[in-house]
Amino acid sequence: MSTTAGWSATRNKNLKLGCEAINGIVLMPGETFSFNKIVGATTKDKGYDTGHGYLEGEVAEVIGGGICQVASTLYVACVEADLQIVERYMHAYMPSYMGASTDATIFYPYLDYKFKNNTDRPIKVEAIASGAKVTCKILSVDTRDYYVKFETVIVKNIPWKTVYKEYPPDNEEGYTDGQVISKSSPYSSVESKSYRNKYSKETNKLISSKLENHETYDSRDKVVVKIVDPN
């Protein structure tokens, strides 16, 4: 499983550090993987730098920005390895590098991503970052007669709106009529479902379909100044 997001040297550095932290981890049957326990806080002391992330509902430069791409890529790899997901949280807004309802957000120490090795054999995590691309695999002996695809259905797409915010002509901010003051690009609200679909290796026909997630991403409207004279 591979994902690619917007390029920046500092964000790519964070991807590399995140992948290095989890790469090579081996889980015996019954053991649980915790992203926060293994990666920990993404601090400057560990070499993490700034990258795009969310801060108070807006895209901002944050230390460790991009680490969620590593968690999200690993999440899909785990589902397609048919592993048990123990803990996972969606982003407030649908990330551009993932399909709807297939992402996993990390916010240390509060929001974690965990999965369990519910197989009868050891598994190994492989995670590699190359520039803005992250590739994650779950390695093990595969004796199954089926394969899994993590597939998404968009239920509803609600377009973002233009919201006008009123200011007087002599406003302290110095805003002018028609000025766009939202800090980030607008996002539409998306309601989506994702399924853990099993297919026969022999016939490629669908064997079973299990709902993995049903959720709605927030919208982020475009905010425009409207100058209104109070007199």
Outline where the language-model segments fall.
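Well-ordered beta-sheet/strand-loop patches within structured domains
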Residues: M1-N231
